[in-house]
């Protein structure tokens, strides 16, 4: 039947396949050949029906099923209509082989790529429980928790991974980031400094991340001397890291110190990543602190247009600027909007009650 199918004798091939199915019913190998033909002939409903039977059959090797699922994953990237069916197939296969690490990993990767981080984490958790030495699965599990804002599990899973991989610095970084999110700054500094010592000098990207995260942690503790030192070190390693340039510049502007340095860094971050609302806000706020109000208004309005209208901080900055320009009505409008959004400063209520 396979020979005849390859040589275009479709009817004869399917006649033989059906005869074979009378002898060995529901044989997944036969179904697979038939399904492949249906898919190539654009008879998707027939193909999907057979693939569903194959993937649900526990007797069919998981490795063969993974090949099928990866084929559908590739198709799903170029054909949106295939995506839902692929996800359904993944679920069918994982139920048939709940303790197969490779199959669970395949489903976890698919879910991660579609940003279904909570569901992806559940499958990566199965993988690391079955194969604790799979470092990449640990990394992905931690990133799932980070992307779903589950910092408790992010911290716990990175700690579990560190027991298995104590010399690999990346997991120290994840653990430190989780601790920063939980506002456990002293502990995060301990972890980040330990991990930083393990980073190879050739890995500039990771080294810069460790140093800037230490800068963030010390900033949160209001240890500005150490914070500035770490940001400077980070920029020595990676001078054009626009996130570090922006964050460092903004922290300086908040403290109303080293504003010319902040202005230079912020200008560079905006040239490296144009149209970024938070970066434009930083530059506008630095100009505000320098008393360059007209230019500040130009940059803060750019920030508003590029998405900053949904930020309490940016609306509060616009309110502060309009107040400086003598337009109390506009100032109050922006302050009220900032209050509604809810991520503005603690002083906002005082401004509104004046």
Predicted regions and their residues:
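Alpha-solenoid helical repeat scaffolds
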Residues: 1-326, 336-354
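Residues that scaffold, gate, or flank divalent-cation-dependent active/transport sites
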Residues: 329
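C-terminal interaction modules of eukaryotic adaptor/scaffold proteins
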Residues: 332
């Amino acid at each position: 039947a396979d020979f005849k199918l390859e040589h275009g004798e479709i009817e004869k091939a399917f006649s033989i396949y059906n005869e074979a199915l009378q002898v060995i019913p529901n044989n997944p190998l036969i179904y697979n050949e038939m399904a492949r033909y249906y898919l190539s002939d654009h008879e998707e409903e027939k193909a999907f029906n057979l693939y569903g039977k194959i993937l649900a059959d526990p007797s069919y090797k998981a490795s063969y099923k993974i090949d099928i699922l990866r084929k559908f994953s590739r198709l799903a990237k170029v054909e949106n209509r295939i995506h839902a069916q692929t996800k359904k197939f993944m679920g069918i296969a994982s139920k048939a082989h709940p303790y197969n690490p490779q199959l669970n990993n395949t489903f976890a990767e698919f879910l991660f790529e579609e940003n279904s981080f909570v569901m992806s984490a559940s499958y990566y958790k199965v993988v690391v429980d079955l194969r604790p030495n799979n470092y990449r699965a640990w990394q992905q599990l931690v990133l799932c928790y980070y992307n779903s804002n589950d910092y408790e599990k992010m911290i716990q899973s990175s700690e579990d991974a560190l027991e298995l991989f104590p010399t690999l610095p990346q997991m120290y970084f994840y653990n430190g980031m989780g601790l920063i999110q939980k506002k456990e700054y002293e502990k995060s500094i301990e972890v980040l400094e330990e991990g930083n010592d393990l980073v190879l000098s050739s890995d500039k990207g990771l080294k810069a991340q460790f140093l800037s995260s230490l800068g963030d942690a010390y900033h949160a503790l209001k240890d500005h001397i150490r914070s500035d030192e770490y940001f400077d070190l980070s920029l020595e390693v990676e001078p054009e890291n626009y996130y570090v340039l922006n964050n460092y510049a903004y922290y300086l502007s908040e403290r109303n110190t080293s504003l010319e340095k902040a202005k230079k860094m912020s200008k560079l971050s905006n040239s490296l990543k144009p149209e970024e609302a938070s970066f434009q806000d930083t530059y506008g706020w630095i100009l505000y602190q320098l008393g360059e109000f007209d230019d500040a208004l130009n940059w803060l309005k750019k920030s508003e247009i590029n998405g900053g209208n949904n930020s309490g901080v940016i609306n509060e900055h616009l309110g502060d600027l309009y107040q400086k320009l003598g337009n109390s009505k506009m100032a109050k409008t922006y302050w009220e909007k900032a209050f509604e959004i809810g991520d503005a400063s603690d002083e906002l209520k005082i401004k509104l009650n004046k």
